[in-house]
Amino acid sequence: MGLKAAQKTLFPLRSIDDVVRLFAAELGREEPDLVLLSLVLGFVEHFLAVNRVIPTNVPELTFQPSPAPDPPGGLTYFPVADLSIIAALYARFTAQIRGAVDLSLYPREGGVSSRELVKKVSDVIWNSLSRSYFKDRAHIQSLFSFITGTKLDSSGVAFAVVGACQALGLRDVHLALSEDHAWVVFGPNGEQTAEVTWHGKGNEDRRGQTVNAGVAERSWLYLKGSYMRCDRKMEVAFMVCAINPSIDLHTDSLELLQLQQKLLWLLYDLGHLERYPMALGNLADLEELEPTPGRPDPLTLYHKGIASAKTYYRDEHIYPYMYLAGYHCRNRNVREALQAWADTATVIQDYNYCREDEEIYKEFFEVANDVIPNLLKEAASLLEAGEERPGEQTQGTQSQGSALQDPECFAHLLRFYDGICKWEEGSPTPVLHVGWATFLVQSLGRFEGQVRQKVRIVSREAEAAEAEEPWGEEAREGRRRGPRRESKPEEPPPPKKPALDKGPGAGQGAVPGPPRKPPGTVPGTARGAEGGSAAPVPAPAASPPPEGPVLTFQSEKMKGMKELLVATKINSSAIKLQLTAQSQVQMKKQKVSTPSDYTLSFLKRQRKGL
């Protein structure tokens, strides 16, 4: 069973618009042909990014010239996807899968697939791969790479399994995606899960197993169960997002960028990106590079991605906020960038940092110890230059420099670190080490003492206890001294991190004083009648409203440092000691880590940029 007649009529594909028409036709069907679309994208990507030299020894392969916008009068060449080439690749893949899987050996009760059948398909893909190749190399995510080079990256293997299942008629097997991993769901209503690929350094022994253990340990890799369960149209969106336009470390293929942008807009118009936050962020990045007339601006798309994560995934995705922060950072919007990073940390605080969460650790490490310090350093330079030459700065540079005089910016910085510290609590792997502390002190020092002192840090737990437990003055005095940091080994651990009322910016965010502050949260205001006394008591004079933002810390480390953070002079030694100390929860769960537990070897690897 090969290509259908309606599919054949769309060939040859001579341009970007021809490829878009093919995708539009497939998306109009109930079951888009994943194998066909992946082969086409892989073919185009190979000859536009991997091998841009026009071959002369392949008689069937031709290139279509068209005018290039840059330089004016130049030509660009698009690889012509001829029917004979694509049909041969298609037939080879389907024959390989159908020849290796005997469906009669795997009865499908109720028309749904069994775990053994899914594992068998996974074995076929896995055993067809080359035994030795660099699995993180670029351009090996498509079925074109699988057929022509027997190479696939991690997510490419998962997609190939889904494509193979579709070729076998297993319509209940779909792709499941977190922000750094892929597996499959199958069975009635997609209730069953199965690992089909590796992650990180390789976990071959997990194939066929469920992801329940990863969900239960609250690791970011499995998003606590708030992962994407794709339908066929979202699987098409996944392969479009996986297009890699890079020719080398410094150059991208303009044609591939245009193709990806047009295909994402096609999916957007059909409503297939509504549940795909990272695709919306990807599209926003492309629009920032080359805006499409009449389309929403990048900022709108970034916020749509955040709204999608809130609506469909319990606001437990990290990258929608990372996309937004990266946009503001590139545009030197210091206040907005710090707020978005703080929101990112607010999401991560409800996870446990596990061994396989290294990718998001690297993202946070880079933000905290490279991006934010450099952004604040640049703002400090602009502020200093503005004081020396006040009439020579533009409005944008003045705004960037003034961020260091804004207590709300400082509150966002504290909220960012509070989320990181909370993330570490209860985690089996430590997060913070002296490298973090050094740059925290540096970033704190960018804000003057009078700016830092305008941030009011309150303790929600202390206020609630004081309101509900009318103990004596001695007990209240003990609470004012703050919780002791020592803990005994036999003490029961505190409850798990709450999942309620945790939305970014809500409950713990930096909010400017009275207008946005809910009533009853500032100590000293009337709490209402608490005894049974009927005699009216004269209300005390209203306390003056707080001058700056009000912040509630969630982590024990930041609670212990709150006086240090807003002191007139920064005590760098005390802050470093407090930040790198093991939290109470960790002391009960594991022995104190040695310095060798903290490895910086990943800094030598290439990282994704913001």
Curated annotation (Swiss-Prot):
Q: What is its main location?
A: nucleus
Kindly state which keywords UniProt assigns to this record, in alphabetical order.
Chromatin regulator, DNA-binding, Nucleus, Phosphoprotein, Repressor, Transcription, Transcription regulation
The modified positions for Phosphothreonine read: T594
Residues modified as Phosphoserine are S487, S543
| InterPro entries assigned | Menin (IPR007747)
Protein name (database record): Menin
Subunit organization: Component of the MLL-HCF complex, at least composed of KMT2A/MLL1, MEN1, ASH2L, RBBP5, DPY30, WDR5, HCFC1 and HCFC2. Component of the menin-associated histone methyltransferase complex, at least composed of KMT2B/MLL4, MEN1, ASH2L, RBBP5, DPY30 and WDR5. Interacts with POLR2B. Interacts with POLR2A phosphorylated at 'Ser-5', but not with the unphosphorylated, nor 'Ser-2' phosphorylated POLR2A forms. Interacts with FANCD2 and DBF4. Interacts with SMAD3, but not with SMAD2, nor SMAD4. Directly interacts with NFKB1, NFKB2 and RELA.
What does it do?
A: Essential component of a MLL/SET1 histone methyltransferase (HMT) complex, a complex that specifically methylates 'Lys-4' of histone H3 (H3K4). Functions as a transcriptional regulator. Binds to the TERT promoter and represses telomerase expression. Plays a role in TGFB1-mediated inhibition of cell-proliferation, possibly regulating SMAD3 transcriptional activity. Represses JUND-mediated transcriptional activation on AP1 sites, as well as that mediated by NFKB subunit RELA. Positively regulates HOXC8 and HOXC6 gene expression.
Output compositional bias ranges, type Pro residues. Answer: 512-521, 537-548
Q: Does the keyword ATP-binding apply?
A: no
Coiled coil ranges:
none
The entry's cellular-component GO terms read: chromatin; histone methyltransferase complex
Species: Bos taurus (Bovine)
Q: Which gene encodes it?
A: MEN1
Q: Any idea which GO molecular function terms this record carries?
A: chromatin binding; transcription cis-regulatory region binding; Y-form DNA binding
Give me the ranges of the annotated region Interaction with FANCD2.
214-390
Q: Which GO terms are recorded in the biological process aspect for this UniProt protein?
A: chromatin organization; negative regulation of cell cycle; negative regulation of cell population proliferation; regulation of transcription by RNA polymerase II
Query: What segment(s) does the record annotate as region Disordered?
Result: 385-404, 460-552
PANTHER family per record = MENIN
Q: What is the lineage of its organism?
A: Eukaryota, Metazoa, Chordata, Craniata, Vertebrata
Top-level taxon:
Eukaryota
Pfam families, A to Z: Menin
Q: Where in the cell is it found?
A: Nucleus
Query: Per the record, where are the segments of Basic and acidic residues compositional bias?
Result: 484-500
Biased composition, class Low complexity, residue ranges: 393-402
